[in-house]
Structures are given as structure tokens and as C-alpha cells.
């Protein structure tokens, strides 16, 4: 159950009261609840732009200029998460704002962090469940192979082969071998031509708590 904070003096106390529904007309001591509707949002993104008050830039001669983002796709990244129970594929675009340096009050660190790690926009997200596989079937080779083929079809349909593609793989489930087979096969013939880099993002364990005993049949 979602909870809301209670305001007492100048300190946020422990969450105690349940929050109302998002379309409720109730208020919190005169302050109305506000929720942003993202159901119609096309892209999932981590890009944040200046607010409307900071979007007006003042030049040295006294004239003002409205800041307008000018985004350009640098490359695409195809992420693959291959667990023992499922396969998740995400295709995202790395975008660069050509007018980012025009932000008001931008520090040197802000500029360096932005260009060192450019933001990404998720374009396509698929898993084996999206193709109708259920329960234990989601972790099988065939499910991952069909999901990979469907991902390559969507990339081609949406005309996202105009930039280089980087492939990032994570974990070592059955879907990893299926994804590679589909990529180098006829299913990924149009995509593999644009792949310029393949990397592994599997996390390595150093110490930590003891892992569960491996299941053997």
C-alpha cells in the first residue's frame, strides 16, 4: 500500500497515512496532489531539460534567446539480459543535445558528466512473454530465439539502421546462445552489418554472502 508523508513542523515524519487515488480531489492540508500522466509517452528517457524560467538565455548585448534542444542520435545500443528464467531485450538510442552548452548556469562538472555519459532513449523493449511464452517456457532456447528475431524485425521496420549499433550482453542463460545464433543468422542479416561493438556487462562476484546451492536434476 502506498503511503504519504505527514508534515509536522519542519521535519518529515514517518509515513503513516495511505495516499488517495491519483484522480482524487482530496488535498493534503490545502496542498492538492499532482501526478504526471505518462501513459501516452512514446519514449522512456532520462533526459531532463531546464525549466521554463531558466530556458530564456540573456546574451551579452542584452537580447534574450529561448533555449531549444537540438537532439541528434549518436548511436544505438542493444541490451540483452539473459537470465535462467527469461530473456529481456532493450533497444535504445544514445542522443546528444547540440545546444546543451547553452543551458543557463551550467558548470564545468555538469558539462563533463553529460558528454561522458550521454543520455539514452528506449525505443523498443521486448521479452519472451511479449510473444506469448508463459511460465517455464520463457527460459527455453526457442523462446529467446523468436524474441531475438522479432526484435530485429522491429528495428528494421522502424528504420533504425542509420547509425552504428553496440550490443551489450548480460548473464549466461539459454537465451544468450539463441540471441547470438539469431544475430549471425538470416534473422539478423540486416542488423549485424551495423554492429560495431559487442561487450559483456555481466557482474562478477567478489566475496559477499554464499550463493544458493545450484539445482541439479
Swiss-Prot record:
Keywords: Mitochondrion, Ribonucleoprotein, Ribosomal protein, Transit peptide. Residues 1-59 form a transit peptide. One of its GO terms (cellular component) is mitochondrion. Its main location: mitochondrion. The keyword Ribonucleoprotein applies. InterPro entries: Ribosomal_uS11, Ribosomal_uS11_sf. It comes from the Eukaryota. One of its GO terms (biological process) is mitochondrial translation. GO terms for molecular function: structural constituent of ribosome. It is found in: Mitochondrion. Component of the mitochondrial ribosome (mitoribosome), a dedicated translation machinery responsible for the synthesis of mitochondrial genome-encoded proteins, including at least some of the essential transmembrane subunits of the mitochondrial respiratory chain. The mitoribosomes are attached to the mitochondrial inner membrane and translation products are cotranslationally integrated into the membrane. Component of the mitochondrial small ribosomal subunit (mt-SSU). Mature yeast 74S mitochondrial ribosomes consist of a small (37S) and a large (54S) subunit. The 37S small subunit contains a 15S ribosomal RNA (15S mt-rRNA) and 34 different proteins. The 54S large subunit contains a 21S rRNA (21S mt-rRNA) and 46 different proteins. This is Small ribosomal subunit protein uS11m. It comes from Saccharomyces cerevisiae (strain ATCC 204508 / S288c) (Baker's yeast). The lineage of its organism: Eukaryota, Fungi, Dikarya, Ascomycota, Saccharomycotina. The gene is MRPS18.
